[in-house]
UniProtKB/Swiss-Prot annotation:
This is Phosphoglycerate transporter protein. GO terms for molecular function: glucose 6-phosphate:phosphate antiporter activity. The gene is pgtP. The phosphoglycerate transporter protein is a part of the PGT transport system. It is the membrane bound transporter for phosphoglycerate into salmonella. It comes from Salmonella typhimurium (strain LT2 / SGSC1412 / ATCC 700720). The chain crosses the membrane at residues 30-50, 59-79, 106-126, 127-147, 160-180, 188-208, 267-287, 297-317, 326-346, 349-369, 391-411, 413-433. InterPro entries: MFS, MFS_dom, MFS_trans_sf, OPA_Antiporter, Sugar-P_transporter_CS, Sugar_P_transporter. Its main location: membrane. Keywords: Cell inner membrane, Cell membrane, Membrane, Transmembrane, Transmembrane helix, Transport. Induction: By extracellular phosphoglycerate.
Length: 463
């Protein structure tokens, strides 16, 4: 890995009397840095969607070519989440995230000066690859600075960064068009968002923090022994800091059944989510005979209902469920099953919109809770690798099932075939939520036993 991305040497130790105050200040800065950084990734990702009408008009690209460009980015992003998140385990989170933003900005500048389809395709693939550098550092930072009892709320706050980022792309690009004019559509669509992303990258470098130990503070496990993840693994003679990213992935993720359970939870969540997002507009227009305006309202409710529900879910999983994430995820998926039937069978505009909003409100909750659980089933130094497996599985398999396989089912069996596919996915998701919950309870028991044994040894030494 490039030297500039590595974690670097530990800072001078913070005096004991200043540890609590410094810790509190640094963790807020760390959270803000990954919130703003991940938000910025969406500015240089979703701007491509806003540029597609001009790709068709100005560059004479066909709908098939534009669809191929979108697919290239999706596939590249899915692969990148797997690889880049694993590499992030061995890097400085703030430098890794900022570097990815700058690389995305450079690619967008290239898009601003390109006109050939194949150059566009290559740059879009590179953008997808560099986009994967954002999520790993985010989860690593949260795992390093926040205990399990707070991760539901903290993770929920971070999770809405993509809603905020996706929401401010249009105003940024719109303002650029107003100032530059439509004749400079490439500058407005790509170069201006790239400049904004570079500014955010600088903010990440200034605000961001490494692990507590790298900032001269005790680690989270030292300050709160109950945070230590106890795993039964083989061939772990090497210290984690002396292991490569691949060795960490193989030892702590690939052989970890809980990492696979939570990844499969995400696969089926993404299947339902992408099945709804990709096919909701055409289903409402062709089957329910909605107008375009009515369809847009239903789609708007589906997307924006996620923000309050995510924040509430974070609070509930911390407070009501005491840090156990999967029971709430199972409840949400069961409710989605019922609402999906209502959405499918209802004829009323109001009822279809309500059911679509409820599904949108709930579908992001299991996805978010799976991301929080990922931080709790592996040691902090392997979080990026676990996030990488989950990201790869969800995009390459989950999104494909919800888009391509749904389309095949509709062509072969009609719309009811597509809905049966989604309902089957919900049942599978609930099954893996249950298995993941059992695994989390097992880890919790191991943690408590380890703490009990440690207390017994300390008591024996004292005597």
């Amino acid at each position: 890995m490039l030297t500039i991305l590595k974690t670097g040497q530990s800072a001078h130790k913070v005096p004991p009397e200043k540890v609590q105050a410094t810790y509190g200040r640094y963790r807020i800065q760390a959270l803000l840095s990954v919130f703003l950084g991940y938000l910025a990734y969406y500015i240089v990702r979703n701007n491509f969607t806003l540029s597609t009408p001009y790709l068709k008009e100005q560059l004479d690209l066909s709908a098939t070519q534009i669809g191929l460009l979108s697919s290239c980015m999706l596939i590249a992003y899915g692969i990148s989440k797997g690889v880049m998140s694993s590499l992030a385990d061995k890097a400085s989170p703030k430098v890794f995230m900022a570097c990815g933003l700058v690389l995305c900005a450079i690619v967008n500048v290239g898009l601003g000066f390109s006109s050939a389809f194949w150059i566009f395709a290559a740059l879009v693939v590179f953008n997808g690859l560099f986009q994967g550098m954002g999520v790993g550092p985010s989860f690593i930072t949260i795992a390093n600075w926040f205990p399990r009892r707070e991760r539901g709320r903290v993770g929920a706050f971070w999770n809405i960064s993509h809603n905020v980022g996706g929401g401010i792309v249009a105003p940024i690009v719109g303002a650029a068009f107003a100032i530059l004019g439509s004749e400079h559509w490439q500058s407005a669509s790509y170069i201006v968002p790239a400049c904004v992303a570079v500014i955010f990258a600088l903010i990440v470098l200034v605000l961001g923090k490494g692990s507590p130990r790298k900032e001269g503070l005790p680690s989270l496990e030292q300050m709160m022994p109950e945070e230590k993840v106890v795993l039964k693994t083989k061939n772990t003679a090497k210290a984690p800091e002396n292991m490569s990213a691949w060795q960490i992935f193989c030892t702590y993720v690939l052989r970890n059944k809980n990492a696979w359970y939570i990844s499969l939870v995400d696969v089926f969540v993404y299947m339902v989510r992408f099945g709804m997002i990709s096919w909701l507009p055409i289903y409402l227009l062709t089957v329910k005979h909605f107008s375009k305006e009515q369809m847009s309202v239903a789609f708007l409710f589906f997307e924006w209902a996620a923000i309050p529900s995510t924040l509430l879910a974070g609070w509930l999983s911390d407070k009501l469920f005491k840090g156990r994430r999967m029971p709430l995820a199972m409840i949400c998926m069961a409710l989605i099953f019922v609402c999906l039937i209502g959405y499918w069978k209802s004829e009323s505009l109001l009822m279809v919109t309500i059911f679509a909003a409820i599904v949108g409100c709930l579908i992001y909750v299991p996805q978010f809770l799976a991301s929080v659980q990922t931080m709790e089933i592996v040691p902090s130094f392997a979080v990026g690798s676990a996030v990488g497996l989950r990201g790869f599985m969800s995009y390459i398999f989950g999104a494909s099932l919800g888009t391509s396989l749904f389309g095949v089912m509709v062509d072969k069996l009609g719309w009811y075939g597509g809905f049966y596919l989604l309902m089957g996915g919900i049942v599978c998701c609930i099954l893996f939520c249950y298995l993941s919950h059992r695994g989390a309870l097992e880890l919790e028991r191991q943690r408590q036993n380890a703490l009990h044994n440690q207390d017994s040894l300390q008591l024996a030494d004292a005597q």
